[in-house]
Regions:
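DG-centered beta-turn motif at the end of beta-strands
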Residues: 165-167
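Binuclear metal-dependent hydrolase catalytic cores
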Residues: 1-163
């Protein structure tokens, strides 16, 4: 299992580094080039070619540092992909995305665009404690204590395991 850290900070800010400023990226982890865990940092760290390879996005919760670049991903992928990207999350997160982000006011509804037969995103409802097979990995959401409905993830691939708390 190959995990690439795209960002792991609560905000996008510059911090001093030994060789100059470092741009912190919000939460995003790319697993095996195809599965993204949280969507805080995508386009600011991945070339379009890399974004096209993403098949599944797992979301832990709705806080902005975990979904910030999801609309940008959708915009970048319109007309660029043959299959929609699966947005996998617990029901509260999927409902919140539709109500507050992809509502036609803040951002277009990429669950229906560019057309309902070929949307950029398709929702996939995760259930706490149930393992699903996504991108060849076992994915189990585990409820964690946070101020909004939130899950962490247990990812299993062969003999490899990653646990991600979300916050």
């Amino acid at each position: 299992m190959n995990v690439r850290v795209l960002g792991c900070h609560g905000s996008g800010q510059l911090v001093p580094g030994t060789n100059g400023p470092i741009q912190c990226g919000t939460c995003g982890f790319l697993v095996n080039d195809r599965l993204l865990v949280d969507a805080g940092t995508i386009g600011s760290r991945l070339f379009l070619e890399e974004q096209r390879r993403i098949q599944v996005v797992l979301l832990t919760h709705l806080h902005f540092d975990h979904i910030r670049e999801l609309p940008t991903l959708a915009d970048n992928l319109v007309g660029e992909i043959d299959e929609p990207v699966v947005i996998a999350a617990i029901p509260e997160v999927l409902d919140g995305l539709r109500a507050h982000i992809f509502n036609g006011t803040v951002y277009p509804d990429f669950f229906r665009l560019p057309d309902s037969a070929r949307p950029v995103f398709v929702p996939y409802e995760l259930r706490e404690g149930r393992e699903d097979l996504l991108c060849g990995m076992g994915v189990t959401p585990i409820r964690v204590n946070h101020v909004v409905p939130t899950v962490g993830f247990l990812l299993l691939e062969g003999a490899h395991t990653v646990r991600y708390s979300g916050d």
